[in-house]
Design a protein with these regions (language model features):
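Short, solvent-exposed micro-motifs at the edges of structured domains
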Residues: 1-151
Length: 151
């Protein structure tokens, strides 16, 4: 079984390098509005994970007061199951049958939300899975059967 809390999410805003005091970077943190919850009204959904109303752009060439990694993505929970049967075939030979199921309950494992406050159309949306590869934690249910002959 694999279980973990959500990974940290760093909320940023894109700014012109001329509007940043150092001029070195265009990705800054926005200002956090005191008293406004990071959880959207009505609760979190895959298309509205972080409340955009909790942030405001930084005026002028200052820096935002939103802490680094202020939000958390969705948690991950995945159960795997494996069964094994040894079948003796005389004294010298043996057969082994093994069945494995990964993501037994076929639970969707969502990735991190988009967290660029300068893109309000997609801010807070989760558009992908934890793992987009063919194997590993976060993939859809997979069943693997193995028959092994040992001598």
């Amino acid at each position: 079984m694999t279980a973990r809390t959500g990974l940290p999410v760093n909320v940023t805003e894109d700014r012109s390098s001329t509007s940043v005091a150092t001029g070195y970077t265009t990705s800054q943190r926005p200002n956090l509005i005191a008293g406004v919850s990071l959880t959207p009204p009505g609760g979190r959904t895959r298309l509205n994970w972080i409340n955009l109303a909790a942030f405001t752009p930084v005026p002028g060439s200052g820096y935002g007061n939103a802490p680094r990694n202020i939000a958390r993505g969705p948690s991950l929970w995945q159960a795997d199951l494996g069964l094994l049967k040894h079948i003796p075939l005389g004294e010298r030979f043996q057969m082994q049958f093994r069945g494995e199921v990964f993501n037994l309950f076929n639970r969707a494992q969502w990735g991190l939300p988009l967290a660029d406050s300068s893109s309000p159309a997609t801010f807070g949306q989760i558009l992908g899975m934890v793992n987009s590869g063919p194997v590993g934690t976060g993939t859809p249910r997979q069943i693997q059967l193995t028959l092994r002959f040992m001598f």
